Amino acid sequence: MAVEQFAESRSLWLKITAWEKAVVVHEVAKLAKPKLVLEIGAYVGYSAMNIARAVRPHGGRVVSLEVDPMHVTIVRNMVEYAGVSDHVDVWTGYCYDVIPHLLDIYGPHSIGMVFMDQKGTRFHTDLQLMEELGLLADGAVVLADNVLKPGAPLYIWHLMHGPYRNCTSVSVREFLLQSEDWMVMGFHDASLPPVAPPPTQLNRVAFESDAFRKRSMFDSVAPSKSDWWAFSQRFVDGLERSGCKPPVVGLHGRDNPVIKPEDIAGIFRSAGRLPPPPPQGTA
């Protein structure tokens, strides 16, 4: 995409889900075939355009939420310029105010995919709101970015101990950086019981995640690469001690993880959402 090329040509890091992250988002949307996708955190519209291209062939629609009015204006112009505005609606406001309107407009069990790219320590609360409103279709796929950096431990707990199956962490490179990040996904199963309360130590990990996120917003106190690496180790250790470290796919080398479309297809097969591949040598 032009947004990605612009950033690469200037070595300018942008908060966009590019490189392997773009592959994950596109493949999940393409394989899930949702009629309605909810994106939380539009930024400049990069992911909204990516998802729209994936769901357009089967008539899917994207509702993208953004709290910043300036970014909303940018996204609306970007999707128009990209030729996908007929498949994308951009709404302004906070999740707890805006999400209930989805029920009024689209009805219950209407959301087939959720992509979350807002504040990581809010992933689980926004997801719980959708559950309480009955917005998620059975089998809806939920995907979130930046789950390792700056981290969303309570979201992982929610997927592994709540009404979801096949929680999987996809290891990817951060755009224009060589650092590892996780995108974590799962499939909604309404027959499972509500999530149990997380252990206290996981709340402490979430507190530290939020502190690192706030530090990263200011150059004078931004974490160094070694700070991030040490925090990532503590993050993973905290998940393991809490019994909620999901299986990881896509990590084909710690310093240069590469995700491939077949990795995403494998997750969908494990969840029973795709048939098994034909035997080798079969036409």
Name each model-derived stretch:
Residues M1-L36:
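Class I SAM-dependent transferase core
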Residues A32-K33, D104-S110, L136-A137:
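Glycine-rich phosphate-binding loop signature in dinucleotide/nucleotide-binding domains
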Residues G41-G45:
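Class I SAM-dependent methyltransferase "Motif I" SAM/SAH-binding loop
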Residues A48-A52:
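Conserved SAM-dependent methyltransferase scaffold
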Residues P57-H58, Y81-S85, G134-L136, Y164:
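Short helix-capping segments at alpha-helix termini
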Residues G59-E66:
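Conserved SAM-binding motif I beta-strand of class I
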Residues D68-M113, T121:
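S-adenosyl-L-methionine
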Residues R122-T282:
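C-terminal substrate-binding/active-site "lid" region of AdoMet-derived donor-dependent transferases
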